[in-house]
Curated annotation (Swiss-Prot):
Binding site for substrate: 99-102, 121, 245, 317-319, 540
GO molecular function: ATP binding; magnesium ion binding; phosphoribosylformylglycinamidine synthase activity
Gene giving rise to this polypeptide: purL
Pfam families per record: AIRS, AIRS_C, FGAR-AT_linker
Positions contributing to Mg(2+) 1 binding: 98, 538
Main location: cytoplasm
Function, as annotated: Part of the phosphoribosylformylglycinamidine synthase complex involved in the purines biosynthetic pathway. Catalyzes the ATP-dependent conversion of formylglycinamide ribonucleotide (FGAR) and glutamine to yield formylglycinamidine ribonucleotide (FGAM) and glutamate. The FGAM synthase complex is composed of three subunits. PurQ produces an ammonia molecule by converting glutamine to glutamate. PurL transfers the ammonia molecule to FGAR to form FGAM in an ATP-dependent manner.
Organism listed in the record: Bacillus cereus (strain ZK / E33L)
Name of the protein described by the UniProt record: Phosphoribosylformylglycinamidine synthase subunit PurL
Record's subcellular location: Cytoplasm
EC number: 6.3.5.3
Active site: 54, 100
Length: 739
């Protein structure tokens, strides 16, 4: 739409054009009051995008305030590009997770690729070098041709971007459930390393300092992407393909190197990624955080399309762009630095004292808005909340143990469930060894990356069992954080902090808002107990298609510190003769389990329960035993129960098996999904020391028979399975479904 054709302020109000942009009548009235006049078309666009849920968190802020966000190691909590945690020796880890769900639903390759690009920029805009990527993915059932297409394209998009940019994709998770059929979830996480003195903030300090635009030129892609992410998907969503951005990983690779060099210069005052809402959010937020204003001359914006209007330039979400503030008079140094990398750096404005965001185009002022009004003063809504109707019904159900005729067949069927099955088809497409710092590659409980120049490592994982959270949001929220910490501990790491990606349906529905509140309550309690504060994250609402919401999926990304790489532990058995221990008791808990879904095609009843005090005690015991060198292998017991955990530890080893004896009712002993459990192996000579240090029950030993045999307490064989056959079933399940 050219400037001549843009509706005037009166038309915007009378024809309710603001509503098409996502503003409500009340919000438009607030804008009018803030400005003391009717906004023009560009100004209406600025407010609509900055006041969207995606940018302002207007529906979720009251809930997010419950998260614990401070701790003795936390250097930067929520509010900047990414959170930062101290790891000693003047070093820190920077990490964040974000969603790119809506774009991936309609343009899966670019949607996933630009999700990766955006999260990388959040990390290096803090001054950190990105060292690892993870992702957490949710899809419908793979039997559906559309789901196959989305799955293949999303994985290809993540691989395409991550591999080209040279940052290893080291871990993550993929789960499949019918509720994600029309609305897949694509959550990307980036982890970076930084020295304390290099930490940078996205703030525009110093009146008279210069505002510069660096990186790729601006096109019309991604206009209103943030608003598109703040509404439900529908049949007409396909028409919003232009709201999906297009990424160029080679450009971003150059941008990383240029920005990391720039950060060493004392000319730099502030730096921020142009992410959701593009130039609008970066300029308004940088000004607002510094208590300053910004003036920008839009004729100077590098444009790759002709005739772009101020509205289009301000709302474009073209990728690989940063906004920086530099000391006045030092602009040429910056231009020269970026030119060396073949990148543009142009002066386009200055910092002012009056807290206003002013935009000029062709000699005229086209917008004048208080920066704080855009960045900080979005209305906050306390949405009505109502317990979901199904919850009381599920809570009252008497939990029945499923009847199983053949335990071996059931184990093989579980190993072939796509959520449990090997994700090798996925991670084989990712370069997880680039930069040669990856110590534990994908496939174990957590990935581990070396901290160069030290004996330390970073353990990292993403976790969320959304079925448990659907059945019981508060309990499920606790479990999501606890399982992430359990995975870090099993890898030899001390859990440090989390980033989260809260994926939910439409918050305007009271039952959905109840899910959000309750799961955040559970997560917050777990974070406090396990001492893993929330240092940042992202909210993705409106994950619905045709009125059907996804399961509540608050994904947890956790990073832990491996104090010495000698402590690194993996899940596979190490040698015959080692003793197998189980930590934690098994109860007949099948609500939301893989077994329940496989047998009934749906989930119901109560989720497994968790006692966070017990969880913490067990994690501390396991970590201390690992650090004391007593543990050969460690694996958390999750989907599919003990039988699956033991099988996975055997599948990962070569030629090894195990003979174990499990007490209690057989189906529960094998397949229940009780929490706070570990499968640990220990050298025979360490038996006494280990048993003094850890409350664990010896259940058997590792053998060189290449078979897993499980007995009941009467010593009757429940199942014997050949490890090669299990490996073949487990590894072949996803490729077979994709044929």
């Amino acid at each position: 739409m050219s400037l001549m054709l843009e509706p005037n302020p009166t038309q915007i109000k009378e024809e309710r054009i603001y509503a098409e942009m996502g503003l409500t009548d009340e919000e438009f009235a607030m804008v009018e009051k803030i400005l003391g006049r009717l906004p023009n078309y560009t100004e209406t666009g600025l407010f609509s995008v900055m006041w969207s849920e995606h940018c302002s968190y207007k529906n979720s802020k009251p809930v997010l305030r419950k998260f614990p966000t401070t701790g003795e190691r936390v250097l930067q909590g929520p509010g900047e590009g990414a959170g930062i945690v101290d790891i000693g020796d003047n070093q820190a880890v920077v990490f964040k997770m974000e969603s790119h769900n809506h774009p991936s639903a309609i343009e899966p390759y670019q949607g996933a690729a630009t999700g990766v690009g955006g999260i990388i920029r959040d990390v290096f805009s803090m001054g950190a070098r990105p060292v690892a990527l993870l992702n957490s993915l949710r899809f419908g059932e793979l039997q559906s041709p559309r789901v196959k297409y989305l799955f293949e394209e999303v994985v290809a998009g993540i691989a395409g971007y991550g591999n080209c940019i040279g940052i290893p994709t080291v871990g993550g998770e993929v789960q499949f459930d019918p509720c994600y059929e029309g609305n897949p979830l694509v959550n990307a996480m980036c982890v970076g390393l930084i020295n304390h003195e290099d930490i940078k903030k996205g703030q525009a300090h110093g009146a008279g300092n210069t505002v510069m635009y660096v990186g790729a030129s601006t096109g019309r892609d991604g206009i209103h992407g943030a608003t598109f992410a703040s509404e439900e998907l529908s049949e007409s969503s396909e028409a919003k393909r232009p709201a999906v951005q297009v990424g160029d990983p080679f450009m971003e690779k150059l941008l990383i190197e240029a920005c990391l060099e720039l950060i060493q210069s004392d000319a730099l005052v502030g730096i921020q990624d142009m992410g959701a809402a593009g130039l609008t959010s970066s300029s308004a937020e940088m000004a607002s955080k510094a208590g300053m204003g910004i003036e920008m001359y839009l004729d100077d914006v590098p444009q790759r399309e002709t005739g772009m209007t101020p509205y289009e330039m301000m709302l474009s979400e073209s990728q690989e762009r940063m906004l920086i503030v530099v000391k006045k008079g030092r602009e040429q140094e910056i231009v020269d630095l970026f030119e060396k990398y073949g990148l543009a750096a142009v002066t386009m404005g200055k910092v002012t004292e009056d807290k206003m965001l002013r935009l000029f185009h062709k000699g005229e002022m086209v917008a004048e808005v208080p920066a704080d009004a855009l960045a900080e003063e979005a209305p906050i809504y306390h949405k009505p909340s109502k317990e979901a109707a199904y919850f009381a019904e599920f809570q009252q159900m008497k939990m029945e143990t499923p009847k199983i005729e053949n335990y071996k067949e059931t184990l093989f069927a579980l190993l072939q469930q796509p959520t449990i099955a090997s994700k090798e088809w996925v991670y084989d497409q990712y370069d997880y060894q680039v930069r040669t710092s990856t110590v534990v590659t994908p496939g174990s409980d957590a990935a581990v990356v070396r901290v160069r120049g030290t004996e330390k490592g970073l353990a990292m994982t993403t976790d969320c069992n959304s079925r448990y959270i659907y059945l019981d949001p508060e309990m499920g929220g606790k479990i999501a954080v606890a399982e992430a910490a359990r995975n870090i501990v099993c890898s030899g790491g001390e859990p440090l902090a989390i980033t989260d990606c809260l994926n939910f349906g439409n918050p305007e529905k009271p039952e959905i808002f109840w899910q959000i509140e309750k799961s955040v309550d559970g997560m917050s309690e777990a974070c406090r107990t396990l001492q893993t504060p929330v240092i940042g994250g992202n909210v993705s609402m409106y994950n619905e298609r045709s009125g059907e919401a996804v399961y509540p999926t608050p994904t947890v990304g956790m990073v832990g510190l491996v104090h010495d790489l000698k402590h690194v532990t993996t899940q596979e058995f190490k040698q015959a003769g080692d003793l197998v221990y189980v930590i934690g008791e098994t109860k007949a808990e099948f609500g939301g389990s893989e077994l329940q879904k496989m047998l009934h095609g749906k989930i119901f009843g109560q989720s497994p329960s968790i006692d966070l005090g017990v969880e913490l005690k067990r994690q501390k015991q396991v970590l201390a035993a690992i650090q004391a060198g007593l543990v050969q292998s460690a694996h958390d017991v999750a989907e599919g129960g003990l039988a699956v955990a033991i099988s996975e530890s055997a599948i990962g080893a070569n030629g090894l098996g195990a003979t174990v004896k499990l007490d209690g009712e057989a189906t529960a002993a094998l397949f229940a999904e009780s929490q706070s459990r570990f499968v640990i192996t220990v050298k025979r000579e360490n038996k006494e020391v280990f048993e003094k240090a850890v409350e664990a029950i010896q259940v058997g030993e590792v053998t060189n028979t290449n078979e897993v045999t499980i007995h009941n307490e009467e010593n009757e064989v429940l199942l014997t399975a050949n490890v090669d056959e299990m490996r073949k079933a487990w590894k072949g399940a996803i490729p077979c479904l994709l044929k």
